[in-house]
């Protein structure tokens, strides 16, 4: 199934996310903006958390255009659409396990940095890619 077929809408404020609070995905400049995260991304992250079997810290979720610019994000950042997350990860063992979990649940775009992993499902971008920062 292609990612475009699985692509869902923005999360409903009444829907429950099992392992996360919507506030964990807030852009730091707008309280409550984590509600802009795509529901499929949240469901996939719950699956990742289940498989990873350890707490996951979201470093960046939804971003407002202002915050995205402030952190040096690209103009077409998937964070602006609620389709991306950056997960804190600073050791090789967890990094390996977390990447495997992300791939297992269907994240098809992964960026690897020294202290975080970026994962997104943006259907407007090339799929099946992994890069380093």
Question: Model-derived features: where do they sit?
Answer:
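Short, small-residue-biased leader/transition segments that mark boundaries at the very start
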Residues: 1-3
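Periplasmic peptidoglycan-binding/tethering modules of Gram-negative envelope proteins
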Residues: 6
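Acidic/histidine-rich, surface-exposed loop or edge segments in extracytoplasmic proteins
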Residues: 11-32, 79
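Second-shell loop/turn segments in exported
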Residues: 29-37, 88
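Stable alpha-helical elements in mature extracytoplasmic
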Residues: 37-44, 94, 98
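Extended, low-complexity, intrinsically disordered C-terminal regulatory tails
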Residues: 42-72
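Catalytic cores and adjacent binding grooves of peptidoglycan-active enzymes
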Residues: 76, 80-81, 85-133
């Amino acid at each position: 199934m292609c990612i475009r077929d699985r692509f869902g809408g923005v999360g409903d404020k009444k829907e429950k996310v099992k392992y996360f609070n919507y506030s964990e995905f807030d852009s730091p400049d707008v309280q409550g903006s984590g509600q802009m995260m795509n529901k499929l991304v949240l469901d996939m992250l719950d699956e990742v958390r289940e498989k990873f079997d350890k707490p996951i810290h979201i470093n960046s979720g939804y971003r407002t255009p202002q915050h995205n610019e402030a952190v040096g994000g690209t103009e077409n950042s998937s964070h602006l659409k609620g389709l991306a997350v950056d997960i804190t990860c600073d050791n090789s063992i967890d990094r390996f396990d977390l990447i495997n979990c992300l791939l297992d649940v269907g994240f098809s775009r992964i960026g690897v940095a020294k202290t975080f992993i970026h994962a997104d499902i943006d259907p407007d971008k090339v799929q099946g890619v992994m890069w380093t920062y």
